[in-house]
Amino acid sequence: EIYESILKELQSAGSSGEFYTPRAVTDFMAQMIKPKIGETMADFACGTGGFLVSWLKELQKQIKCTADAEKYGKSIYGIEKKQFPYMLCITNLLLHGLDIPQVYHDNTLLKDVLDYTDDDRFDVILMNPPYGGSEKADVKNHFPNDLASSETADLFMAVIMYRLKKNG
C-alpha cells in the first residue's frame, strides 16, 4: 500500500520536472503492440517501470510452460538515471514477480551509440522519452554529428534508432 501511494503521487504530479506516463496509457500501448513470448522490450528512461510492467502484464497471459516463464523474466530491459525512480522501478518489478529485473541505474545518453552491436538491439522499444530537457555539450560527443543535439528528446530518439532491431 505504501508503494502504491508513492507511485500514485509520482504519477499524478511532476516531481522535479518529471512526469510519469499514466498507467492507463502504458497499458493501452502495451496492448496495442501485442507482445509475444520471446520478444524483448526496452525502456531507456524507465522511471518507476510503468511501461515495463504493462508489457509484462500482457506477456503473463501467454505463459504456458517453464520455458515461457524464463523468457518472460528476461523479456524486459530498463535504464533509469535518477536514484529514487530507479529504486521504485526495482520494487515495482519485484512486486510483479521478477526475481532479477534487468533494470540499471545509469544514464542512457552517456554511451557512444556507434558502440552498440546487434546484441544490444530489442524487438520493441516502448517508452516516453524525456521532453523539454537539454544536455551538456559533452553528451553530444556520444552521437554522430548529424544526430548530435542538446535536446534530450532528440538524443533519446537517436538511441532508439540504434537500439531497435531491423524489423522492430
Where are these regions (language model features)?
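Mobile active-site "lid"/loop adjacent to the S-adenosyl-L-methionine
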Residues: Y131-V159, R163, N167
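Generic signal for short, ordered secondary-structure residues
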Residues: K8, D68, D138-V139
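Long recognition/docking surfaces used for binding and targeting
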Residues: E1-L10
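Conserved S-adenosyl-L-methionine
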Residues: E18-M127, G132-S134, S150, D154
